[in-house]
Amino acid sequence: MKFTQTEKKQLMIYVIIAYGITYVLGLLMWYGYGKGLDLSAFPNAQMLYPAAGVMMAYLITRKGDKNLPKAFYIFFVALTAVLVVCTAASVLAPKNIDLMGTPFSQWMLILQYVMIGGSVIFWILLLVSGKEKRRAYG
């Protein structure tokens, strides 16, 4: 199977985002594990990396495509970046709060609120993008 230049570029962008960010934050995870910190924020952010990699690849390589739901893709990549920052902060500046007698990571709480708000905005952006764009890019 022979790949075009665009496909090679898309694959490289995907690999850098989906696996590169995972590797770099894995080092933070290792550090946090050694310190006994709460690492529950990591999987919440990590589940978005593959989709963010695909969306970033499309944003970079298909700039002229009118069917590309750009607002949705840009917001998804931006939200993923915010979650990466929250995840890194949960290890670099850990802070626990007390919720009904149970210690809970402040960053995990912030991350959950960001994901809830982001999900609502995702639905709005997806509905506003129109049927044609949704059909073209799933």
Question: PLM features: residue spans?
Answer:
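Short, Lys/Arg-rich, polar N-terminal cytosolic tail immediately upstream
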Residues: 1-8
